[in-house]
């Protein structure tokens, strides 16, 4: 839900160029999250895991913050340059192959390796936005920009979740985590962006409407 809503707000801003839509979208997301945390039990637990992750009672309870804390310890263990490929202990963090793939990589590659991965994502997103800005029509512009920000939002939500910047959700890290449907969807995004980039090289821009 958060990913779809975020993509909708980004595409609305891209189509209109009005920052007020983006600000309103952020406000609605914050308000919706607050209301959900008070009315939905599982959302309230996720907020508790986020805000008080190191509380022993929350760590030990079912569905608690154990994996979040273990992921943070894994990132801390990696330090600046990491322990080396294959030298980490990903089995100490539950779901290290999917939701917590980034802490596992951070332990082995360190802060430098994590920054390198994030830079690759930034390059991918920036290229997608450039494809949209150079698009031959407004539909291509919205499609390319929306797809690029879909990847950006996934990365932000996952990186923010495992580092306690925001509450953790059930998304996977694009192209890294073991998630069948998610992985296929992200590679379809790559294919569509490549097709759009091929179409913007020779065609003049056409404005619809």
Segments (PLM) and residue ranges:
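Structural signature of hydrophobic alpha-helical transmembrane segments
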Residues: 1-5, 114-118, 183
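Hydrophobic transmembrane alpha-helices of multi-pass, membrane-embedded glycosylation machinery
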Residues: 2-12, 27-31, 122, 190-191
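Structural signal for the C-terminal ends of transmembrane alpha-helices
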Residues: 9-19, 36-37, 122-132, 193-200
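Hydrophobic, glycine- and aromatic-enriched re-entrant/interface helices and adjoining loop segments
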Residues: 19-116, 136-140
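Transmembrane helix-bundle signature of multi-pass membrane transporters/permeases
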Residues: 30, 92-93, 104-107, 147-151, ...
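Alpha-helical transmembrane segments of multi-pass membrane proteins
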Residues: 33-37, 120, 147-157, 191
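Loop-to-helix entry and N-terminal half of a specific, functionally important transmembrane alpha helix
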Residues: 131-170, 176
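A juxtamembrane structural motif centered on a specific transmembrane helix
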Residues: 157-209
